[in-house]
A protein has these predicted regions:
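NTP-dependent small-molecule kinase module
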Residues: 2-6, 30, 146-217
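Pre-Walker A (Motif I) flank of P-loop NTPase domains
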Residues: 7-11
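Conserved lysine of the Walker
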Residues: 22
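Hydrophobic positions on the alpha1 helix immediately C-terminal to the Walker A/P-loop
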Residues: 25
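ATP-dependent small-molecule kinase phosphotransfer cores
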Residues: 36-130, 204
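A glycine- and Lys/Arg-enriched "phosphate-lid" helix/loop adjacent to the NTP-binding pocket
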Residues: 107-173
Length: 217
């Protein structure tokens, strides 16, 4: 067991497109934290607070009215602001770890690469909404869109899940570009079976924990 009792709160995010297995592998990640006796809190985006969950419903509910891309972006950051100030930042400040299903990387991938909105808009909103808050490590579950679509074919799809494959191809490329520029983002091959994907997730988080245990040495 690595010695992490005196560590400050940490922020871990898990990213991935539809069908990548985020929920399953967040459970794997959390089991690794449990094994180290780490106090953590799991949350998600959009959402994480009562108000932010209402915004999530607005964002994901299928509707006939055209959803303007900038409206979508602003709603996402409105939900994120509530989440950051009421949940994420306070918990990290008190020393608790936060594990979040998606964060701002998703906005760059979906609204930036997928929707084609200017990245400068996202940069500005990110600074306004979260300041210097950034994840300490991000696990990106990479999966070809056609594989993801097949995995979720039997469930009722939300508004975003109903997008065309070209949209999800752009989202995937956006994530891969982010990973190429950010060493905190670890790419996990989510096309493998559950056991092998879980093994990758455990290896990545255990490596991260070992790196923290040596920070003060």
């Amino acid at each position: 067991m690595v010695q992490l009792a005196d560590q400050p709160g940490r922020f871990i995010t898990v990213e991935g497109s539809e069908g990548a297995g985020k929920s399953t592998n967040i459970s794997v990640l959390c089991a690794a934290l449990d094994a180290e006796g780490i106090d953590y809190y799991c949350t998600r985006e959009p959402g994480g607070t009562a108000f932010a969950e209402e915004i999530r419903e607005l964002l994901l509910k299928p509707r006939e009215e055209r959803f303007d891309n900038l409206t979508e972006l602003l709603l996402i950051f409105a939900a994120r602001r509530q989440h950051v100030v009421n949940v994420i930042q306070p918990r990290i400040t008190t020393g608790q770890w936060v594990v979040c299903d998606r964060f701002t990387d998703a906005t760059y991938a979906y609204q930036g690469s997928g929707r084609g909105l200017p990245l400068e808009w996202i940069d500005t909103l990110r600074l306004w909404v979260q300041g210097s808050l950034e994840p300490d490590i991000t696990l990106y579950l990479d999966l070809a869109p056609e594989v993801g679509a097949a995995r979720i074919a039997d469930r009722e799809l939300d508004r975003l899940e109903r997008e065309q494959r070209a949209f999800f191809e752009a989202v995937r490329q956006g994530y891969l570009e982010l990973a190429s520029r950010n060493s905190r983002i670890r790419i996990i091959d989510a096309s493998q079976n559950l056991t092998d994907v879980g093994r990758q997730v455990r290896a990545a988080i255990e490596e991260f924990l070992r790196s923290l245990s040596g920070e003060g040495h």
